């Protein structure tokens, strides 16, 4: 179980390998990845609870062709996801980078589910 430090703890020296700023979904995912590599990790969050932009979106994570979607027989594809993103930004985004993000979010979601037992549901 990780230790939770309050502001009073910062009067002491803390020796860590990795500092993650922000305790939202991205920050916590970064912390898990660093921990998986055997690093000691400190997550610094300014709020009194973990939050971030994913919390503002009700915890929704857009992705396509994830294991969770396949298990729930959700018909979606990376091509549909790509078309949705490009239509939303009126084809202004760099298509290469959009495709890379789509590939990486699918891998990240599957990694969180398989390696860290994250339960995902379809809304």
Language-model regions, residue ranges each:
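N-terminal Rossmann-fold NAD(P) dinucleotide-binding loop
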Residues: 27
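Beta1/beta-strand and adjacent pyrophosphate-binding region of the FAD-binding site
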Residues: 10-24
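Aromatic pocket-lining residues of Rossmann-like dinucleotide-binding sites
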Residues: 34
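Conserved N-terminal/central alpha/beta ligand/cofactor-binding core
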Residues: 2-10, 40, 46-121
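Residues that mark the start of a beta-strand
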Residues: 17, 38-40
């Amino acid at each position: 179980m990780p230790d939770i430090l309050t502001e009073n703890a910062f009067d002491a020296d803390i020796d860590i390998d990795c500092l993650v700023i922000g305790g939202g979904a991205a920050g916590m995912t970064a912390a898990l990845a660093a921990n998986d590599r055997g690093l000691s990790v400190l997550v610094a969050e300014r709020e009194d609870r973990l939050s971030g932009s994913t919390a503002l979106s009700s915890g929704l994570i857009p992705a396509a062709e994830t294991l969770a979607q396949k298990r729930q027989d959700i018909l979606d594809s990376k091509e549909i996801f790509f078309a949705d993103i490009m239509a939303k930004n009126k084809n202004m985004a760099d298509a290469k980078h959009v495709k890379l993000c789509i590939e990486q979010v699918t891998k990240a979601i599957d990694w969180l589910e398989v390696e860290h037992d994250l339960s995902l549901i379809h809304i």
